[in-house]
Amino acid sequence: ADPFLADLPGRFLFAVTDATGAVLTEPVDAAYQALTPTSGVIRLAGLGMPCARDDAVAHLLERARLFLTHREGPRVWNIRDLPADSPVFAGLEPMPVDPAPPLTPGPVGGDLVAGIPLAMLRATHLSALVAITDDVVITPWRSLVVPSGAEFAADLEEAGFTVTESDPWARLSACTGAPWCARTSSPTMDLALESAARLGPDGPRLHVVGCERACGAPTLDHVLVVDPHSVDDILSADGALAR
């Protein structure tokens, strides 16, 4: 362990992905994308360089150390916020990426992508999972992949998972909000829970946040609902009150 790396901001993200680059839709800071069983590329802020698989972890950690050394103060949280001439980017070249889109709720062959409302696993969720599987894959998109889970979609939906794209929770998310975040008085998650019961299947993706920082915002197109204090504030942003 390297104690120096303990100073990395909580929003600093590493990623490891395969040739599809699926997780690179997210705002990761430092990533390794495997292109063959033994080699791939290091990616930072639209730049990259070839890297052997066995060297990837050491290289990612070294870039993280450079970030801590050269950022201009503790309020610089992410590599993408650094100037283009930062030593963090030494040796990297422009390297476009065309990642696969995020997984959405529903069956994928015999497997099932099960969305987790507000990314909060509850006892009912876990009880349903242990009844059908010993293994799940956690995604970066507030969901799980349940191997061979497609045939159990109805059971998982009853337990509170989102298993279709028509479920309101497939297009609704929220930051932590009050009372857990001192930056806002808006109870974002409570309001999102109340709103979900009144949202229809159609409409824009909504992300409810307590302030302009917009923590947890999805990378896909969405409507940002900032500092709401009633369910109507969210439904107005959705257009539901006008329909």
Tell me the role of every PLM-derived stretch:
Residues L35-L103, S127, L235, A242-R243:
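An acidic, glycine-/histidine-flanked metal-binding catalytic module
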Residues P107-V108:
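A short mid-domain helix/strand-loop element embedded in enzyme catalytic domains
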